[in-house]
Amino acid sequence: MPEGGKALNGMLRSEKDLIALREAVLRQRDPNKTCVTICGETGCLAWGGEELRLAFIEEIRKQGLERQADVMRTGCYGLCERGPIVVILPQQIFYQQVTVEDVPEVVSETLLGGRVVQRLLYVNPATGRAVTYDHEVPFLQRQMRRVLSDNGWVEPTNVHDYIARDGFAALSKVLFSMAPEQVIEEVEKAGLRGRGGAGFPTGRKWRFTRSSPGDVKYIVCNADEGDPGAFMDRSVMEGNPYLVLEGMLIAAYAIGAQNGYIYVRAEYPLAVQHLKIAIARAEELGLIGDEILGSNFSFHLKIKEGAGAFVCGEETALLASIEGKRGMPRARPPFPAVAGLWGKPTNINNVETYANIRSLILGGAKAYAAIGTAGSKGTKIFSLTGKINNTGLLEVPMGTTLREVIYQIGGGIPKGRLFKAAQMGGPSGGCLPPRYLDLPIDYESLTQVGSMMGSGGMIVMDEKTCMVDMARFFLNFTQDESCGKCVPCRIGTKRMLEILTRITKGEGQEGDIELLLEMGQVIKDSSLCGLGQTCPNPVLSTIKHFRQEYEAHIRDKQCPAGICEALTFAPCENTCPVRCDAVGYTALISARRYDEALNLIRLTNPLAGICGRACNHPCEKMCKRGEIDEPIAISSLKRFAADWERRMGKMAPPTFLERSKEERVAIVGAGPAGLNAAYHLGRRGYPVTIFEALPVAGGMLAVGIPAFRLPREIIDYDVQFICQHNVEIRTNQALGKDFTIDDLLRQGYKSVFLALGAHGNPRLNIPGEDAKGVLPGVDFLRRVNLGENVEVGDKVAVIGGGDVAIDAARMALRLGAREVSIVYRRTKEEMPANAEEVEEAEDEKIKILYLLAPTLILTDNGRVKGMECVRMELGDYDESGRRRPIPVRGSEFIMGVDTIIPEVGYKPELTCFKEEEGFKITRAGTLASDPVTLATHI
């Protein structure tokens, strides 16, 4: 808002003058006057925020509204993803992604007409509802803004705006009603800890500095924020520089300092500009200088612009830089509180620490300490970046969980992908995997799991992030920023980086992981400063939580995330379980070379016709085209190529890679795994015999998927193609009934491949599930597909949300059921079934009842007559990134049904394997085998 007149600009010589100025400013302002506030932070400026501000000024002038409306540039609102942000006060109407072209409409509709421009409102992705007011935006609604509370209400360089919101009231309070010792005691009682990363108690640091002998002492603000993805301090300085100055003034009074420095990197030109203006205006009013507010306290402040060296965030390196020396750490003790700047006692805190002081003093230690956890008090600002829907700044109480930040405030992971990890504490922090989503974010909790608070950077990663490459990225940064003073940091990080680079290039060796762990620990233990002591953290934490990714890079020469170029041909190919060359065959199809495309598919996948119809195509989820608009229809193109050959009526001849061998191989199970293994073994010259318990080949393809979705002639065609390659299939041969493993070995088979599938039905574990009319989903589909006469009632309920549940429901409808319902305990968004199949079910008028779970099956003479269900609501998120369903108390009701088909998963049936034969069953219900070769103990 505009500055006041000359009477508001005189020197303040007492506490009464400050109060009088505040009252004068407030008298001159109409709280009900319209004010168009525009985010003026660097991010929104990059979006065109300054041009937007000028456009509003011009349009308001054109409409003759200068007396009715002001235009004000403000600090960061936090929701940087949606900039430029415009908020209309006093109503607090929240507009996002506003452009210069939108200005005339906003002025005419909102300022003149009092109507909201709907298309500029923020739409809540969870509800699809447009949000009108800023306090309704979920990103802002769930925060506790203390340091950022003035952002959006003050013009950053306008000292009167700041004073009007109790600016410098805390300084006045300590100068005229508190002794320095009382100030320190208040900060100690509040439990404020340094927000720069180490978390050292602020009050204790102030006390150390005050108690150090010497007449000359210094206050220093560490504004050298250099973490990748971090911009908390920059936004505070840009949006409310007076808040930082007031905190520094109070600290200077408490420790007895007369001079101070703000060390800010020159890469923050807007922050530097605002700080210079703020210092100048404070000096004009007598809030910085000699005898502040007529007291005997004097303080002078200078800005020192740093060159951007990351190591200068370390306090002794920072002090050396202020002194004009090269920014390099020194050994401690003595600590800066004893011998700091020019050998004098010096207190160093970062921007956010000083910005906490005003609210702490005005509200009192008790109120401040009521926020947060036992060991971490107050709020913390985080910069939320990476694979997250809502990037930006957020301020939450200490102890808020990672889950709340990522899903409730951050809006979850884009494109429905899964959360993989969060890098906390910047390049020197550690990553947190999904099992730590419910970890409270505080100093102690993060340290216990190998991470750190740092300055507040939080980088979110999804399944497309390679953790090895991420560790290499952060180590490359810290190695490049190492000052080189100590050998462990200078040489050790270089050697670690070389190893990581080799691994990402596919040149990793056995023992590299152990060497990284050993070197990382040595560097942590022997480095001189905090940079070296923490820089191995990303490597150590990724090995701890994602060791299997390192092993995949080294042993399998694969990057599971498809990021490392040397190990990845294309993301789609890398994601495919059989590494099918989707890039190649789509290109061949586009060139109308259909036979070559099919041959390329069959290099890795002989089930082209089947997978073109029944595959869940994870390749499309990773398709680069999907980041622009929609993924390429990779699965449909595979189907097209396979159908083209079948229509031509000429099956491709067999192709063998090696000459025939004498060693025979037995395969148990003619499902997709068994057929694929037989095909590749046959191509390499091995005679293969498949023993299948069912009367048909195909396994779950034949008996688990309905023919209307996967026609039997398609299965038969692909099986016939496989059998050309020296493969024999014997049906009605069940392991444990018709033969044993010993029988196969006695018959001369040199190896046995077990591909039994998962044909078992997990139980619901509710009363009544053994009644007549309860047909387990896998059994139901198998019986129908094998031609058995399966009767269903008029009203069928299918329990579950997967593909088998959808198939069972559609099959029940075809068997004569008049009404079919699917009962699923979560919402449609969490449903694991293929979206296309869900749509087909809805088109067939199948009811899908979401947020519902069965609790009891009602019977009459042993037969189903109904089912009791309870309504569910979504609670917290689980490790898969889905919200847990929670029963709604008292919401039980009865569904009238006569057939229930439970389908809540499937499991392997391993009763044919005996421990006395040498087989071992794991706790998860699978056969124990080597994790790399999958060989059993036999």
Protein language model annotation of sequence segments:
Residues 659, 663-668, 716-766, 856-868, ...:
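Feature captures the FAD/FMN-dependent oxidoreductase FAD-binding
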Residues 660-673, 792-802:
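Beta1/beta-strand and adjacent pyrophosphate-binding region of the FAD-binding site
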Residues 121-189, 343, 349-364, 568, ...:
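Flexible inter-domain linker/hinge segments
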Residues 143, 272-398, 410:
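Hydrophobic alpha-helical positions that pack around
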Residues 9-34, 50-73, 90-119, 170-187, ...:
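Ferredoxin-type iron-sulfur electron-transfer modules in oxidoreductases and energy-metabolism complexes
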Residues 664-689, 805-813:
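N-terminal Rossmann-like FAD-binding beta1-loop-alpha1 element of flavoenzymes
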Residues 770-794, 877-938:
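FAD-site-proximal beta/loop scaffold in flavoenzymes
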Residues 687-730, 782-784, 809-856:
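Rossmann-like dinucleotide-binding cores of NAD(P)H-dependent redox enzymes
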